[in-house]
A protein has these predicted regions:
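Short, charged, intrinsically disordered terminal tails
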Residues: 181-193
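Structural signal for interior beta-strand "rungs" in well-ordered beta-sheet cores
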Residues: 2-173, 178-179
């Protein structure tokens, strides 16, 4: 059945199904769908979906986040707009604010995911896990090609595609170096008809 703790608000368009429990002081909705979900105290789930997963206390989900089965999201976490999490564990204090996919991953405490981060978990034959240590900083538009481990306190430069493990406290840069071709545009200008 469904259980809702004292002081929690269910806003319009919210649907709770299966064995779903909502802690005390939560705000769920508007337009949220939770099925077999366990939500901790003082957590907000705004216009998002949570399936067969657990969310800790004082965590903010959404808007427009999709928490797929098998996920455990800790406390004091931000899962923002257009973030999808599948079969992953996210430790306390981590921020995944927008436009990110975290699948088949184990994420440490106090990590920061830049916009457009993707854990690339499937090679057409098998799904692999990504492990991210505590206090890691992942720059925008990063691809993490699993299986891969990101060490504690490491940084990943924006635009990187990571294929090898990153040691703790290291900076990983995995992108092509920019080249500027002087006067290229002038030489290749489209002639008006």
């Amino acid at each position: 059945g469904v259980a809702v703790g004292a002081g929690s608000a269910l806003l319009p368009g919210t649907i709770l199904r299966g064995h779903t429990s909502i802690g005390c002081g939560c705000t769920i909705g508007p337009n949220s769908y939770l099925e077999n979900a366990k939500i901790g105290d003082d957590t907000n789930v705004n216009s998002s979906q949570v399936y067969n997963s657990t969310v800790g206390y004082d965590t903010h989900i959404g808007p427009f986040a999709y928490i797929r089965p098998g996920s455990t999201i800790g406390s004091h976490i931000r899962v923002g707009d257009f973030v999808e999490i599948k079969n992953s564990t996210i430790a306390d204090g981590t921020k995944i604010s927008h436009l990110t996919y975290v699948g088949d991953s184990d994420v440490g405490q106090n990590c920061n995911f830049g916009c457009g981060t993707v854990t690339v978990n499937y090679d057409r034959a098998k799904k692999y896990r990504t492990t991210i240590g505590d206090n890691a900083f992942i720059g925008c538009n990063t691809n993490l090609i699993a299986p891969v481990t990101v060490g504690d306190g490491s940084y990943i430069a924006a635009g990187s595609t990571i294929t090898d493990d990153i040691p703790a406290m290291a900076l990983a840069i995995a992108r092509a170096r920019q080249q500027n071709k002087k006067d290229w545009a002038a030489k290749h200008k489209i002639k008006e008809k």
